[in-house]
Amino acid sequence: MAKLTKRQKAIAAAVEANKVYTLEEAVQVLNSLPAAKFKESLDISVNLGVDPRKSDQVVRGATTLPAGTGKTVRVAVFAQGAQAEAAKEAGADVVGFDDLAESIQGGNLDFDVVIAAPDAMRVVGKLGTILGPRGLMPNPKVGTVTPDVAGAVKNAKSGQARYRVDKAGIIHAAIGQVGFDAAAIRQNVETLVADLKKLKPATSKGVYIKKITLSSTMGPGLTVDVNNVSN
């Protein structure tokens, strides 16, 4: 049997098996673990009472986090004319139309979010095989296809959690970074959970928010008391 590393031993010592944590306790534990060699994100997983095999129970959305994510987000925008100028003023890193599409087809994908004005979708649609697998395809359901490209840029830059329920009925999102204090994480988590509740499918029955888990990139997953997150 392989020996545990110092980090693994520290994690084992800090985590109580089968414990359900308050949000503050979970943040404290994750922040107290030995640091990795890079800035770890704090991630949330929420088990939902949905059946993702049914098209009307696929929960998908984007939540602007009040305390941000701590990450620098590069944004590309497909727009022209006044909308292109507005996107630039809002802080977009790359703005273009046909020229941006050609750049992407050439392999330039140095951005984290793609936003498109509605009239640009005829151009963006041709990039589905490139953007789709990378989770970059603009979609009106998450606010990345919109006439208000400037507003979408500001939201993306300020820090957004984008999510789509997986086959197991779970959504995953970055909610901050290791080092964020508990108050900031609580702001972000409560905002996300409130948005998830607004997205509850009408056909979903029984308990909707079934389980919440908080983890760091290289750390353990800690179960958080659902009732400790405000309704």
From Swiss-Prot:
Please name the InterPro entries in this protein's record: Ribosom_uL1_bac-type (IPR005878), Ribosomal_uL1 (IPR002143), Ribosomal_uL1-like (IPR023674), Ribosomal_uL1/biogenesis (IPR028364), Ribosomal_uL1_3-a/b-sand (IPR016095), Ribosomal_uL1_CS (IPR023673)
Any idea which GO molecular function terms this record carries?
rRNA binding; structural constituent of ribosome; tRNA binding
Query: Does the entry feature the keyword DNA damage, yes or no?
Result: no
One GO BP = translation
Q: Does the keyword RNA-binding apply?
A: yes
Q: What keywords are annotated for this sequence in UniProt?
A: Repressor, Ribonucleoprotein, Ribosomal protein, RNA-binding, rRNA-binding, Translation regulation, tRNA-binding
Pfam families in the cross-refs: Ribosomal_L1
Q: Name one GO cellular component term.
A: cytosolic large ribosomal subunit
UniProt-listed NCBIfam families:
rplA_bact
Reported function = Binds directly to 23S rRNA. The L1 stalk is quite mobile in the ribosome, and is involved in E site tRNA release.
Homology family: Belongs to the universal ribosomal protein uL1 family.
Q: How does it assemble?
A: Part of the 50S ribosomal subunit.
Q: What is the recorded name of this protein? A: Large ribosomal subunit protein uL1
Q: Which organism is it from?
A: Acinetobacter baumannii (strain ATCC 17978 / DSM 105126 / CIP 53.77 / LMG 1025 / NCDC KC755 / 5377)
Species classification: Bacteria, Pseudomonadati, Pseudomonadota, Gammaproteobacteria, Moraxellales
